[in-house]
């Protein structure tokens, strides 16, 4: 069991998008059963769109972690770290791989109201999913009072996250 770390951003990183990194989580040329996959984002790239992290299950990864490089993490205020701009009307980030962690990202969707900013559905297994040290902000849902910040119904841990400026009609 190895920890395989891949960098995400510009300037010679392994991947230019989080989506490209996630698409390779079941790539047997990169990972083996039992590996721990770690994607490290840098604040030198614009990450945008809807992201679903559900890879690694076919190959049998032990865990999947999406994090931000230590020097590029937010300082507790918007715009100070690596940002995932949703700008999509569904889910900005869906965390659906077993034993998965997302941490230190800023998640925002100011342009297009998102249904939910972070969605951690029950994937049919009881392995944990964890969200920590996230900034989730600026979503003007404008439709209903649905839980639009973090939706984490089963087998999830959420800690040290700040959720703010989410608006209802």
Residue ranges and their predicted role:
Residues 3-41, 46-48:
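Acidic Gly/Asp/Thr-rich repetitive segments characteristic of extracellular carbohydrate-active
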Residues 22, 37-40, 63-65, 105, ...:
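Short Gly/Ser/Thr-biased coil->beta-strand turn/linker motifs
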Residues 73, 140-143:
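Flexible, glycine-rich phosphate/dinucleotide-binding loops
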Residues 67-68, 97-109, 125-141, 153-169:
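Right-handed parallel beta-helix
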